[in-house]
């Protein structure tokens, strides 16, 4: 479980760390830099996940601080991440965001473009794509979208799925090969 720590002060996060929570999610780069830069230097076990929309101009701040990106959704961003990783000599674990419901208001790679995008990211840009991420539509049967993500995971032979939010937790329990990462 990724503890979503966005908007919470360190005074509320520290008890989680003291009790063994190591994976934390942030969606605002500047807030994360201010909050986590010093504590991550002191505690190398902590893993920080970028769970929000990432703009290319923020990548230079994300690569040195974060360990995971859950929102890779376009080739320009992929190229910027690849370039910055070379500069910083660091390889993040990256999830491709899939627009599983084909919703115009949501970011993400369309299913029909996913295989080509994945291959470009892994073969040409040498990105470490560890999984797929989706935020399912609020309408319809969420489980069907999760099942479709499981099939996409198998087709691409990636390790992990990052799917859903706290309210999707029970549904994920009943999904075959459910999410490896859940934001709570």
Write out the residue ranges for each language-model feature.
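Single conserved hydrophobic/aromatic residue that forms the stacking wall/gate
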Residues: 174-184
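Conserved alpha/beta-domain cores
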Residues: 1-160, 165-167
């Amino acid at each position: 479980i990724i503890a979503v720590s966005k908007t919470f002060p360190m005074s509320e996060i520290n008890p989680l760390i003291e009790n063994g929570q190591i994976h934390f999610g942030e969606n605002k780069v500047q807030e994360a830099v201010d909050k986590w830069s010093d504590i991550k230097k002191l505690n190398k076990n902590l893993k920080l996940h970028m769970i929000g929309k990432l703009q290319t101009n923020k990548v230079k701040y994300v690569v040195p601080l974060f360990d995971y990106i859950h929102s890779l959704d376009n080739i320009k961003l992929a190229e910027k991440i690849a370039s910055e990783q070379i500069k910083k000599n660091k390889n993040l674990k990256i999830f491709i965001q899939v627009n599983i419901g084909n919703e115009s208001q949501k970011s993400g790679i369309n299913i029909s473009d996913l295989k080509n995008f994945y291959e470009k990211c892994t073969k040409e840009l040498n990105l470490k794509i560890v999984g797929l991420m989706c935020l399912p539509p609020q309408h319809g049967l969420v489980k069907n979208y999760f099942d479709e993500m499981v099939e996409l995971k198998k087709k691409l032979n990636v390790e992990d799925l990052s799917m859903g939010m706290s309210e999707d937790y029970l549904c994920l329990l009943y999904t075959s090969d459910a999410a490896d990462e859940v934001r709570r």
